Amino acid sequence: MKKYLVRFVTIDGDYDKEWCYAENSEEAESSILSDRWDVDYIEYVEEL
């Protein structure tokens, strides 16, 4: 597992970020989308 920083924009227009562990960037993006109901779109996913 690798550590990823996922930066996203919420439905309110606020920028937010969360850390997660995943096998790849697509899995990290999916993890955030399933955990957070207020995500409008993902801005970027960065491997740390």
PLM feature spans:
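Short, mixed-charge low-complexity intrinsically disordered segments
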Residues: 34-48
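Residue-level detector of intrinsically disordered/flexible regions characterized by low predicted structural confidence
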Residues: 4-5, 19, 48
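Short aromatic-glycine-(Arg/Gly/Cys) micro-motifs in beta-strand/loop hairpins
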Residues: 1-14
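A short, exposed loop/beta-hairpin motif centered on an aromatic-Gly-Thr core
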Residues: 13-23
